[in-house]
Amino acid sequence: MVKIRLKRTGRKKLPFYQIVAADSRAPRDGKFLEIVGHYQPTAKPHAVTIKKDRVSYWMQTGAQPTDTVRSLIRSTGLLHELRLRSLGRSEADITAEMEKWQQNQTERRQKRLAVKTRRRQAKKAAEAKGAEA
C-alpha cells in the first residue's frame, strides 16, 4: 500500500520534513516513490508547500495520507477541493467555493490572533497590578 507521509531531513534539533509518497513497508527515511511537498515546523508560522496535482494524483490512485500529513493537506484546502471534485462540481463552482474557504480561513486566523493579543494584554496588566501591590 502507498502512503503519503513525512520523511525527516535537516539536522539535529532543527527538523525539516519532505512529504513523500512511499510504500508503507519502507523505512521512514528510506526509499520513496516521489516527493510531493515540504514541511518546515520550526518556521513561524509553519511553512508547508505541497504539489497539489501530485498529491491529488496519488490520493486518487489509492494512497493513504498519515494523520499528520492529512492535517497538513487539510490546512492548504486540498482535501476540500478534492471532495468537491469527487462530488462532480464544475470548475467555476470549485473556484468560488475555494475562494470562500480561503476567506473563511483568513477570518479564523485573525480571530485567533485577536484572542492571543487580548490574553497577552490581560496578562501584562495583571503582572503590572501585582508588581504595584
Curated annotation (Swiss-Prot):
Coiled-coil annotated residue ranges, if any: none
SUPFAM superfamilies, A to Z: Ribosomal protein S16 (SSF54565)
Residue ranges crossing the lipid bilayer per the database entry: none
GO biological process, one term: translation
Name of this protein: Small ribosomal subunit protein bS16
Membership in a protein family: Belongs to the bacterial ribosomal protein bS16 family.
Start-end of Basic and acidic residues biased regions: 124-133
InterPro entries, per database record: Ribosomal_bS16, Ribosomal_bS16_CS, Ribosomal_bS16_dom_sf
Entry GO terms, CC: cytoplasm; small ribosomal subunit
Pfam families in alphabetical order: Ribosomal_S16
Basic residues bias (residue ranges): 109-123
Keyword Ribonucleoprotein assigned: yes
Gene Ontology MF term list: structural constituent of ribosome
Entry-linked Gene3D superfamilies: 3.30.1320.10
Region (Disordered): 99-133
